[in-house]
């Protein structure tokens, strides 16, 4: 792409008002054209760089997208599966909030050209409309897409580009976290959860929503990848939401183990998961865990921690950057069939302390790194809010 400047020569412009107006219009048009050209060039370069990144890290992505079973009748196919799926993937990469908005944002020759280049479809002249993509996604098997995600994750792990992010040089950190997806006063299906608002009044109503538990792989502090999702299902009116979320987490853990049977994993999550069954599930799968802990999670553990920390006396204060923090920990807390350790961190001058419970061994030399790993789940949740 080459840009050329238009040269305009002016003579006695002060005495020629019509000519002055004409020159102003020409300059304005020139400025707009040059700006559009720069934006077009920037978009094109961004597209080229994106193609390079995808082809370098995920050379098998396009073939895998093309192998997804297409349930559409051949006579009605206008867009290849790879174009439909890649458009949806790019919509997520660029944080576009809806598929309807994607059709608007992507409606440019540059974007169409880039997606055509990415999908190796030179004859692509238009992108599929958002309704076309949604109808296609409803028909395909989600397990096929999950398989692709797992294959991409395996390739990232084999690349050894993120080895420094492992906990204690061995265990991949996976965050488990619940997220709400949309809400409505209309019941979508029998699996959706609901909340009752203004209960017992004339304004009482039910709000229906979907809730999922996600597994997110930590590759770097600013690179956290969602690798698997499990829906929290309505298990009956008497079942509390936290019990539903825990059960969804256990199903998610089974799927993770099946997809990555030999992967050394440390699961991190909030205090909701601090319970006997979670500890046992991790032990059975040969995983470690690092969880936020609150007093109400397991009162007996909190009571023992408060009494033992005075005896073990591991606490110390340390300055880190511009902050000064208080570190403390207690080892060998016996709970049912699990030996636990608990760590505490508090920034000087603040009232709130952060507590973490784990089956990792804790010593003076590794408590700071352990707490930093535990806080990643909290930081991730904060960045999304």
Task: Label each residue range with its predicted role.
Residues 1-59:
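Charged, often Cys/His-bearing segments associated with DNA-binding zinc-finger transcription factors
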Residues 134-221:
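Active-site-proximal, Lys/Arg-enriched surface segment
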Residues 87, 102-103, 129, 133, ...:
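Short, conserved catalytic/metal-binding motifs centered on acidic residues
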Residues 76-151, 155, 219, 275, ...:
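Short, positively charged, Gly/Tyr-enriched micro-motifs
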Residues 198-264:
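Electropositive, glycine- and tryptophan-enriched low-complexity nucleic-acid-binding patches
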Residues 51-86, 131-134:
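Basic, short loop/linker segments at the boundary and entry of helix-turn-helix/winged-helix-like folds
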Residues 53-54, 102, 364-385:
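Short amphipathic alpha-helical "interface-anchor" segments enriched in bulky aromatics
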Residues 234-343:
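An internal, acidic/charged active-site-proximal segment
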């Amino acid at each position: 792409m080459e840009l050329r400047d238009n040269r305009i020569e002016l003579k006695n412009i002060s005495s020629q008002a019509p000519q002055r107006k004409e020159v102003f219009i020409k300059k304005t048009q020139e400025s707009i054209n040059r700006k559009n050209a720069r934006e077009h060039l920037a978009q094109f370069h961004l597209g080229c760089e994106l193609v390079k990144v995808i082809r370098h890290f995920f050379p098998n992505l396009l073939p895998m997208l093309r192998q997804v079973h297409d349930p559409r009748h051949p006579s009605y196919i206008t867009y290849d599966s790879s174009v439909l799926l890649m458009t949806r993937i790019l919509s997520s990469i660029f944080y576009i909030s809806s598929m309807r908005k994607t059709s608007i944002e992507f409606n440019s020759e540059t974007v169409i050209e880039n997606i055509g280049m990415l999908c190796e479809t030179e004859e692509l002249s238009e992108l599929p409309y958002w309704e076309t993509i949604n109808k296609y996604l409803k028909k395909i098997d989600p397990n096929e897409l999950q398989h692709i995600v797992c294959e991409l994750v395996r390739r990232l792990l084999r690349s050894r580009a993120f080895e420094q992010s492992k906990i204690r040089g061995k265990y991949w950190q996976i965050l488990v976290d619940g997220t709400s997806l949309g809400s409505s006063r209309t019941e979508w299906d029998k699996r959706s959860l609901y909340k009752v608002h203004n209960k017992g009044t004339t304004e009482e109503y039910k709000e229906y929503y979907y809730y999922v538990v996600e597994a997110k792989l930590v590759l770097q502090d600013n690179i956290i990848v969602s690798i698997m999702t499990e829906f929290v299902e309505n298990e009956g009116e008497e079942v509390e939401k936290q019990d539903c979320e825990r059960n969804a987490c256990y199903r998610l853990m089974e799927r993770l183990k099946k997809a990555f049977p030999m992967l050394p994993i440390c699961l991190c999550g909030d205090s909701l998961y601090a319970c006997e069954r979670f500890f046992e599930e991790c032990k059975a799968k040969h995983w470690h865990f690092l969880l936020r802990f609150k007093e109400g999670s397991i009162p007996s553990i909190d009571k023992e921690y408060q009494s033992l920390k005075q005896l073990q006396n591991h606490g110390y204060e340390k300055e880190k950057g511009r902050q000064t923090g208080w570190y403390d920990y207690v080892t060998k807390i016996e709970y049912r069939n699990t030996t636990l350790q608990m760590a505490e961190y508090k920034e000087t001058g603040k009232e709130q302390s952060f507590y973490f419970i784990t089956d990792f061994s804790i010593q003076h030399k590794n408590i700071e790194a352990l707490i930093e790993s535990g806080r990643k789940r909290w930081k991730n949740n904060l960045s999304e809010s």
